[in-house]
């Protein structure tokens, strides 16, 4: 039987003596932030892109406006939408 050299447990560990190097710390922080942003993007991508595309606008505030004026405004907005439904743009390519 021949003698077999087995590694000592200390050699299996991670040698991170230089982990206090600012470049290593910065790379670790950037990696963690990137991972967090990627996970958030995958979870909420539809709502995030919708916010960027349409903005946070939900229409003008109606606080302090009488109900009759609110109803009139709603009707004007609906009429404008209905009028747009009748318009079709025809583009002919030559």
Swiss-Prot record:
<feature type="modified residue" description="Phosphoserine; by host">
    <location>
        <position position="90"/>
    </location>
</feature>
<protein>
    <recommendedName>
        <fullName>Matrix protein 2</fullName>
    </recommendedName>
</protein>
<keyword id="KW-0449">Lipoprotein</keyword>
<feature type="compositionally biased region" description="Basic and acidic residues">
    <location>
        <begin position="68"/>
        <end position="77"/>
    </location>
</feature>
<feature type="transmembrane region" description="Helical; Signal-anchor for type III membrane protein">
    <location>
        <begin position="20"/>
        <end position="40"/>
    </location>
</feature>
<feature type="site" description="Seems to be involved in pH gating">
    <location>
        <position position="38"/>
    </location>
</feature>
<keyword id="KW-1043">Host membrane</keyword>
<dbReference type="GO" id="GO:0140321">
    <property type="term" value="P:symbiont-mediated suppression of host autophagy"/>
</dbReference>
<keyword id="KW-0597">Phosphoprotein</keyword>
<keyword id="KW-0945">Host-virus interaction</keyword>
<feature type="site" description="Essential for channel activity, possibly by being protonated during channel activation, and by forming the channel gate and the selective filter">
    <location>
        <position position="34"/>
    </location>
</feature>
<keyword id="KW-0406">Ion transport</keyword>
<keyword id="KW-0946">Virion</keyword>
<keyword id="KW-0564">Palmitate</keyword>
<feature type="region of interest" description="Disordered">
    <location>
        <begin position="58"/>
        <end position="80"/>
    </location>
</feature>
<keyword id="KW-0813">Transport</keyword>
<comment type="subunit">
    <text>Homotetramer; composed of two disulfide-linked dimers held together by non-covalent interactions. May interact with matrix protein 1.</text>
</comment>
<dbReference type="InterPro" id="IPR002089">
    <property type="entry name" value="Flu_M2"/>
</dbReference>
<keyword id="KW-0375">Hydrogen ion transport</keyword>
<keyword id="KW-0735">Signal-anchor</keyword>
<feature type="glycosylation site" description="N-linked (GlcNAc...) asparagine; by host">
    <location>
        <position position="17"/>
    </location>
</feature>
<keyword id="KW-0325">Glycoprotein</keyword>
<keyword id="KW-0472">Membrane</keyword>
<keyword id="KW-1032">Host cell membrane</keyword>
<dbReference type="Pfam" id="PF00599">
    <property type="entry name" value="Flu_M2"/>
</dbReference>
<feature type="topological domain" description="Intravirion">
    <location>
        <begin position="41"/>
        <end position="94"/>
    </location>
</feature>
<dbReference type="GO" id="GO:0015267">
    <property type="term" value="F:channel activity"/>
</dbReference>
<comment type="similarity">
    <text>Belongs to the influenza viruses matrix protein M2 family.</text>
</comment>
<keyword id="KW-1083">Inhibition of host autophagy by virus</keyword>
<keyword id="KW-1133">Transmembrane helix</keyword>
<dbReference type="GO" id="GO:0020002">
    <property type="term" value="C:host cell plasma membrane"/>
</dbReference>
<comment type="function">
    <text>Forms a proton-selective ion channel that is necessary for the efficient release of the viral genome during virus entry. After attaching to the cell surface, the virion enters the cell by endocytosis. Acidification of the endosome triggers M2 ion channel activity.</text>
</comment>
<dbReference type="GO" id="GO:0055036">
    <property type="term" value="C:virion membrane"/>
</dbReference>
<keyword id="KW-0407">Ion channel</keyword>
<feature type="modified residue" description="Phosphoserine; by host">
    <location>
        <position position="61"/>
    </location>
</feature>
<keyword id="KW-0812">Transmembrane</keyword>
<dbReference type="GO" id="GO:0016020">
    <property type="term" value="C:membrane"/>
</dbReference>
<dbReference type="GO" id="GO:0015078">
    <property type="term" value="F:proton transmembrane transporter activity"/>
</dbReference>
<keyword id="KW-1015">Disulfide bond</keyword>
<feature type="topological domain" description="Virion surface">
    <location>
        <begin position="1"/>
        <end position="19"/>
    </location>
</feature>
<keyword id="KW-1182">Viral ion channel</keyword>
């Amino acid at each position: 039987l021949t003698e077999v050299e087995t590694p000592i447990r200390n050699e299996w560990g991670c040698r991170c003596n230089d982990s206090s190097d600012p470049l290593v710390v910065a790379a670790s922080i950037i990696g963690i932030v990137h991972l967090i942003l990627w996970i958030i993007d995958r979870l909420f991508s539809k709502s995030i892109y919708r916010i960027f595309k349409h903005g946070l606008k939900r229409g003008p505030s109606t606080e302090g406006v009488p109900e009759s004026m609110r109803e009139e405004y709603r009707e004007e907005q609906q009429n404008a939408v209905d009028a747009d439904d009748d318009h079709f743009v025809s583009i002919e390519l030559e």
